[in-house]
């Protein structure tokens, strides 16, 4: 059995760890609320662009943008994989990368190649370990994502699809459901689903005038729409990260509390045993006299 001094040292060590995890839990809770606000604020922008693009597409059926055309010519599929830059957020990244691994095996069985863009250090490290072809990446996004940091890597994928080098583009991220639940998602980004670009009846009743022309506006809007979808995925992933980290740190703090209680019980038993032994020795000594 360990000595009382050793047990006290362990208790002190676990208490210090608990202070750290508790502080990280509080920081993550604060960041989570801000991340949720950014996530909700990004949705109206993408919804409005989608409505305008849908109106244009249905009002000009004779023009078909490359983002709406499905192709099977290149036998290459693109992935935009959104993960975190840091760890200590439970199994969030593991769950996302697990569905990526499953999809990669399916594509390999079909004889298709894969090109990937990594957003986040964890995804980049994973892709490098498995030997995937990473065409671009963005790391150190921070707690406040900016589209400026994402446009470069995203444009690589969009240009490749527009040039016919990719058959499809998927985005993988963790969707924020609530504080206790986050779900890994894999969604087809390109070609755009036609059902997502259906205009409301009210918007079709208006006859808009577009300058310089409808085709130019469609070209620009669809690119902005796809960028908005990716930004939304990053915002969702960030909210999920902070939520998962808060839950993980709370669990760590609770576990540390349990360990401290157990160590204190062991310490008290050890101390009681030492006292009992000393008393026995005193009694034995007195009897001998």
Curated annotation (Swiss-Prot):
GO cellular component assignments: plasma membrane; proton-transporting ATP synthase complex
Keywords assigned: ATP synthesis, Cell inner membrane, Cell membrane, CF(1), Hydrogen ion transport, Ion transport, Membrane, Transport
GO molecular function annotation: ATP binding; proton-transporting ATP synthase activity, rotational mechanism
What PROSITE patterns does the annotation carry? ATPASE_GAMMA
Task: List the membrane topology term(s).
Answer: Peripheral membrane protein
A Pfam family that this protein carries is: ATP-synt
Q: Name one GO biological process term.
A: proton motive force-driven plasma membrane ATP synthesis
Asked if the Swiss-Prot or TrEMBL record annotates the protein with the keyword Hydrolase, the reply is no
Under the heading InterPro entries, the entry gives: ATP_synth_F1_ATPase_gsu, ATP_synth_F1_gsu, ATP_synth_F1_gsu_CS
Source domain of life = Bacteria
What is the protein's quaternary organization? F-type ATPases have 2 components, CF(1) - the catalytic core - and CF(0) - the membrane proton channel. CF(1) has five subunits: alpha(3), beta(3), gamma(1), delta(1), epsilon(1). CF(0) has three main subunits: a, b and c.
Instruction: Provide the family line.
Output: Belongs to the ATPase gamma chain family.
| The protein's role, per its UniProt record | Produces ATP from ADP in the presence of a proton gradient across the membrane. The gamma chain is believed to be important in regulating ATPase activity and the flow of protons through the CF(0) complex.
Question: Under which name does UniProt file this protein?
Answer: ATP synthase gamma chain
């Amino acid at each position: 059995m360990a000595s009382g001094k050793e047990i006290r040292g362990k208790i002190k060590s676990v208490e210090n760890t608990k202070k750290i995890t508790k502080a990280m839990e509080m920081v993550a809770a604060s960041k989570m609320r801000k991340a949720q606000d950014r996530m909700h604020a990004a949705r109206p922008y993408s919804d409005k662009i989608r409505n305008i693009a849908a109106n244009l597409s249905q009002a000009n059926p004779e023009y078909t943008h490359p983002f709406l055309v499905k192709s099977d010519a290149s036998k290459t599929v693109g992935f935009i994989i959104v993960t975190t830059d840091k760890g200590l957020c439970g199994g969030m990244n593991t769950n996302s990368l697990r569905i990526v691994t499953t999809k990669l095996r399916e594509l390999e069985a079909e004889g298709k190649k894969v090109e990937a863009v990594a957003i986040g250090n964890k995804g980049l490290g994973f892709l490098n370990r498995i030997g995937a072809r990473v065409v671009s990446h963005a790391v150190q996004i921070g707690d406040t994502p900016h589209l400026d940091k994402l446009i470069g890597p995203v444009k690589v994928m969009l240009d490749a699809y527009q040039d016919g080098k990719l058959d499809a583009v998927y985005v993988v991220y963790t969707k924020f459901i609530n504080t206790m639940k986050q779900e890994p998602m894999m969604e087809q980004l390109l070609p755009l689903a036609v059902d997502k670009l259906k205009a409301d009846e009210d918007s079709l009743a208006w006859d808009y005038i577009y300058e310089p022309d409808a085709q130019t506006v469609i070209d620009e809007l669809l690119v902005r729409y796809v960028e908005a979808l990716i930004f939304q995925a990053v915002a969702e992933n960030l909210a999920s990260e902070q939520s998962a980290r808060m839950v993980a740190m709370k669990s760590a703090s609770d576990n540390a509390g349990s360990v401290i209680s157990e160590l204190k019980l062991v310490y008290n038993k050890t101390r009681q045993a030492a006292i009992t032994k000393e008393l026995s020795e005193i009694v034995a000594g007195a009897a001998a006299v």
